[in-house]
Amino acid sequence: MHFLFLLFSFFTFLPINDKGLCNLNNTAFNAGEKISYTIYYNVIGLYVNAGKTDFTVQSTSFNDNDAFTFTAIGKSNSKYDWIFKVRDRYESVVDAKTLLPYQFTRQINEGSFHKKEMVKFNQKARTASTEEEVYKTSECTFDVVSAIYAARNFNYSNLAINDKIYLNFFLDKSLYPSYFKYLGREVITTKYGKFEVIKLAPLLLKGSMFEGGEKMTIWVTDDENHIPVRIETPIVVGSIKVDMVGYQNIRYPLSSLIELVNN
């Protein structure tokens, strides 16, 4: 199980309303944004700081089209590098208007496992191309990184409890359809502070680390930024918690923040 995939696993199964994201407008973030997270692992009732990841947004161009570059960099806690060293980088270049990906790359360095991959998307032809093969996709296909930012632009205001919302994404040579379930609104306290949040439960595919089903919970800020501030999920051994611990250059004031936690 790849380190950043612990984080992406919930985002990649954050599917989007079939009415919406083929023609979305970005209203949730600006170029220059940076969101930082700490990943905690719990195996015997005690959460251990296992690593961190940063998500950034930059303006760019791709084939003379205005674009964004989304980058996620994950690192294991240096205290545990001698056990299992992780240095991962995921990057997606997307159309600035639709947020659909042009190109997705990832560099995985985890212990003795190393992998580099590039996928080029043709949204009109509905294909995803690697060095080895061209794969058929579907209308509005995202990669794991672009799906995060697309989901932040979804309008949650008209959902009823247990509504399901759908998205297609391409990963590891396969196209995945899935959904997430809207569970309502509440207030939670994270490592950063107390927030008004939107609560979501994505459908996870069964894998080596996850049991599958709707066992993961995600909380995103109940404001125009829609920033994920906490993720919790059981895994085969123990559980994982991911908390937002910092941000820079967000598009709107963080109006969902009720109070900061004194660290």
In which residue ranges do the predicted regions lie?
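Hydrophobic, well-structured mid-protein blocks that either form specific transmembrane helices
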Residues: 113-156
